């Protein structure tokens, strides 16, 4: 049930009955509202029946339902309160008035199964308000109420057990279970769906409700009474999946461990490996959602420490579900294809960053550089074929004085005669074969990922996929036009040249300095520039029409920039981009309105809108620059996964070591050696920079360098000094520096070092 307001009212006695209600609490169903006689916009509806009228009525009903979901829910909750006050039985259950409830239940005419506006019974209301005494009276009088679900669209399927569980009323849960309440009942109402406007998602079963609210006692009670920990909701999510989606990470980790302790060995597959309808296990879902706390918690359960030697620790990390080798839906691919920015933070976690670094340095970067070099040579070959395309002098007479064409395309029979033509033919065949290979490589990925994900994800190179596929089609169109002797091959050839060379920017993602800039360009084009083009089109249409009207009566020979409407549009576009200056002829008098209109156009277009575009692009650059390393790391992962799928296995061996060598089965592991004292010198520099008093923490830093750094908490106590009384701006600056210092110290002392993609010696990988 929804969040109802608890109103302070006097206890309901035997005579205190709502006005207009029967003393026995019989509740009558309200009449359904009548259809409106008029359309919401004021149009009367015809009375004749027919297909058009039926469609019209459906459209009107659909238009009526386009109100806010939250507003509809609020109205139903208000109606629910009204119905409760109109029904003595429901009101007694709400007020926990056991005496009045007993009197009402003794009347033969009392309908104990009556329902409120949400389809709730009196037992639902008693459970909602934690009224244990009223609930016991109702269950004694009508035990079947325990099994009754709510019937409204919002709360369909919810039983009293669901409500008692979510309120953490342990005594009521015990009473309901003792009377046979179903532990497998499913709450399928729209309130319980996983939607953006829903504030909670607790699944559908009472067990998932109990796990999400963090009640360990209720979880144990439900499991003891037969609750299935492997039960899945309509989305295929188990209780472990649902815990991943909860905001309270601490309770989620505790409940996760508790539920796994009940997962016996009578199943072939562990509960952690049960996928939902999207094929995601709880571990993969944690990565896709960017739940770092749960991801680290699960990784702690999957790692095996080999040995510890002072500050050195050798750890084996299980790569199951992480590595893209042998997994069509690996965690690496899921992270780079999701739209959630938080998921990219998983790429900075151990062992994901080490695995990505290992793959990129060993195989990804060399193969990607070779692929880029091959493509550049290929596009140069295609360019040379276009530059030296077969042409011959034009022999037809020119009738149009403005036509200055001198050469024309050769026929197919004349195009391949000389040895120079044969050499060009080899290049053309290479270009055609390359275009076919591009289509064969790209099209399968479209069907595998879907059109939206393949072309819409910037990290995957979405716009570049559009460019390269369009380029390949233009090459094939040029070939067809050449074979059929159709004039105009210059059109697809020109498009192919522009697109082919623009696609060279795709290979900039292999370099940390250039990769993020390609994303900036994409975001500016498809974000800032697209929005700006709408405004620019409106301004150009308005002023071009004005210029055309002004010069409509003038001699076009003296000033022909706005002679006809298409020319006026093009000239205004050039003026907007300041490609040309304002047209003027000082030998004749120009219309006065031209000067006024052009002055307004110059102010709006040049001074206002162009500077607005520059400001928008600057803001986009600032936002992307703050995510530069994160975006480049995601580009590296996407490129690595792409190359791994395309190349044969003999050219890309699997990374890691097989668990059979360590008695860990057939799973693959990555061994990471962590040295926590690598950044001690950098810590000392930070500490000296922020030192403000004598030797409060320098003695600790001068201790034996072999001593193991445990946590940052003791250093935080030594390095926290009282802030002197200074101005507000100085205090704010000091606070920010303090946060920076604390963050740097605590991060380094924990041994969490972001060196997954650097060339330094911060991490060592031994395979």
Curated annotation (Swiss-Prot):
Observed phenotype of the null mutant: Mutant mice have lower body weight than their littermates throughout their lifespan and low fertility, due to impaired calcium homeostasis. Mutant mice display strongly impaired intestinal Ca(2+) uptake and increased urinary Ca(2+) levels. Still, their serum Ca(2+) levels are normal, probably due to compensation by another calcium channel. In spite of this, mutant mice display decreased femoral mineral density; also when they are fed a high-calcium diet.
Keyword match Nucleus: no
Known outcome of mutating residue 581 to A: Abolishes binding of Mg(2+) and increases pore diameter. Impairs intestinal Ca(2+) uptake
Chain residues that bind Ca(2+): 581
Keywords assigned: ANK repeat, Calcium, Calcium channel, Calcium transport, Calmodulin-binding, Cell membrane, Glycoprotein, Ion channel, Ion transport, Membrane, Metal-binding, Phosphoprotein, Repeat, Transmembrane, Transmembrane helix, Transport
Domain of life: Eukaryota
Residue spans, topological domain Cytoplasmic: 1-366, 448-462, 509-528, 617-767
GO biological process: calcium ion homeostasis; calcium ion import across plasma membrane; calcium ion transmembrane transport; calcium ion transport; parathyroid hormone secretion; response to calcium ion
CDD domains (alphabetical): TRPV5-6
Post-translational modification note: Glycosylated. Phosphorylation at Tyr-201 and Tyr-202 by SRC leads to an increased calcium influx through the channel. Probably dephosphorylated at these sites by PTPN1.
Region (Disordered) residue spans: 1-39
Intramembrane residue ranges: 565-584
Organs and tissues of expression: Detected in intestine (at protein level). Abundantly expressed in pancreas and placenta, and to a much lesser extent in stomach and kidney. Detected in kidney and duodenum.
Sequence similarity: Belongs to the transient receptor (TC 1.A.4) family. TrpV subfamily. TRPV6 sub-subfamily.
Name of the protein described by the UniProt record: Transient receptor potential cation channel subfamily V member 6
Species the sequence originates in: Mus musculus
């Amino acid at each position: 049930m929804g969040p109802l307001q608890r109103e302070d009212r006097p206890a309901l006695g035997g005579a205190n009955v709502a006005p207009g209600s029967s003393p026995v609490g019989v509740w009558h169903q309200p009449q359904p509202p009548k259809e409106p006689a008029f359309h919401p916009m004021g149009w009367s509806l015809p009375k004749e029946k027919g297909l058009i009228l039926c469609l019209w009525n459906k459209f009107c009903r659909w238009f009526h339902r386009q109100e806010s979901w939250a507003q509809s829910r609020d109205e139903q909750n208000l109606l629910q309160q009204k119905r409760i006050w109109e029904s003595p039985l429901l009101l007694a259950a709400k007020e926990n008035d056991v005496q009045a409830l007993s009197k009402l239940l003794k009347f033969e005419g009392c309908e104990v199964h009556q329902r409120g506006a949400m389809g709730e019974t009196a037992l639902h209301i008693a459970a909602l308000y934690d009224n244990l005494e009223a609930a016991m009276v109702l269950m004694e009088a009508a035990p079947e109420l325990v099994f009754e679900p709510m019937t409204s669209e919002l709360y369909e399927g919810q039983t009293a057990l669901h409500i008692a569980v979510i309120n953490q009323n342990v005594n009521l849960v015990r009473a309901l279970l003792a009377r046979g309440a179903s532990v497998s009942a499913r709450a399928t109402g729209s309130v319980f769906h996983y939607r953006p406007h829903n504030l909670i998602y607790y699944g559908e079963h009472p067990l998932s409700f109990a796990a999400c609210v963090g009640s360990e006692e209720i979880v144990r009670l439900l499991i003891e009474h037969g609750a299935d920990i492997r039960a899945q909701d309509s989305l295929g999510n188990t209780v472990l999946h649902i815990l991943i989606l909860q905001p309270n990470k601490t309770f989620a980790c505790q409940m996760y461990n508790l539920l796994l302790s009940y997962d016996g060995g009578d199943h072939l597959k562990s509960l952690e490996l049960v996928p939902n309808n999207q094929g995601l296990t709880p571990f993969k879902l944690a990565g896709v959602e960017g739940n770092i706390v749960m991801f680290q918690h699960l990784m702690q359960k999957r790692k095996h420490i080999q040995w510890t030697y002072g500050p050195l620790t050798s750890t084996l990390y299980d790569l199951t579900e992480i590595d893209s080798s042998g997994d069509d839906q690996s965690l690496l691919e899921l992270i780079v294809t999701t739209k959630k920015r938080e998921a990219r933070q998983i790429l900075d976690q151990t062992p994901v960053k080490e695995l990505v670094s290992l793959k990129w340095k060993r195989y990804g970067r060399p193969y990607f550089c070779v692929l880029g070099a091959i493509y550049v040579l290929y596009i140069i070959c295609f360019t040379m074929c276009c530059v030296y395309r077969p042409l011959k002098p034009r022999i037809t007479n020119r009738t149009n004085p403005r036509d200055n064409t001198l050469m024309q395309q050769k026929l197919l029979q004349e195009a391949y005669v000389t040895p120079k033509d044969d050499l060009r033919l080899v290049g053309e065949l290479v270009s055609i074969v390359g275009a076919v290979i591009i289509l064969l490589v790209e099209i399968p990925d479209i069907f595998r990922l879907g059109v939206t994900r393949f072309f819409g994800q910037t990290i995957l190179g979405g716009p570049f996929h559009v460019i390269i596929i369009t380029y390949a089609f233009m090459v094939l169109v040029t070939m067809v036009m050449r074979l059929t002797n159709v004039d105009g091959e210059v059109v697809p050839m020109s498009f192919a040249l522009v697109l082919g060379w623009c696609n060279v920017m795709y290979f900039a993602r292999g370099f940390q300095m250039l990769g993020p800039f390609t994303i900036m360009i994409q975001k500016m084009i498809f974000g800032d520039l697209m929005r700006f083009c709408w405004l620019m089109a409106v301004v150009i249409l308005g002023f071009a029409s004005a210029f055309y009207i002004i010069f409509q009566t003038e001699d076009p020979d003296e000033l022909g920039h706005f002679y006809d409407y298409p020319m006026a549009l093009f000239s205004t576009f050039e003026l907007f981009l300041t490609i040309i200056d304002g047209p003027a002829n000082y030998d004749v008098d120009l219309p006065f309105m031209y000067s006024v209109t052009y002055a307004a156009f110059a102010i709006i277009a040049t001074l206002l809108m162009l500077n607005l575009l520059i400001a928008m692009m600057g803001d986009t650059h600032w936002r992307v620059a703050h995510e530069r390393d994160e975006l480049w790391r995601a580009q590296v992962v996407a490129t690595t996964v792409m190359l791994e799928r395309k190349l044969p296995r003999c050219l890309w061996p699997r990374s890691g070591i097989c668990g059979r060598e360590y008695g860990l089965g057939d799973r693959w592991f990555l061994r990471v050696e962590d040295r926590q004292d690598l950044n001690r010198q950098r810590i000392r520099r930070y500490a000296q920079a922020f030192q403000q008093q004598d030797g409060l923490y320098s003695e600790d830093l001068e201790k034996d360098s072999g001593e193991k750094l445990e946590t940052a908490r003791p250093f935080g106590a030594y390095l926290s000094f009282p802030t002197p009384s200074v101005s507000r701006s100085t205090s704010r600056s000091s606070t920010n520096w303090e946060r920076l210092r604390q963050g740097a110290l605590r991060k380094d002392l924990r041994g969490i070092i972001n060196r997954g993609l650097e060339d330094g010696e911060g991490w060592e990988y031994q395979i």
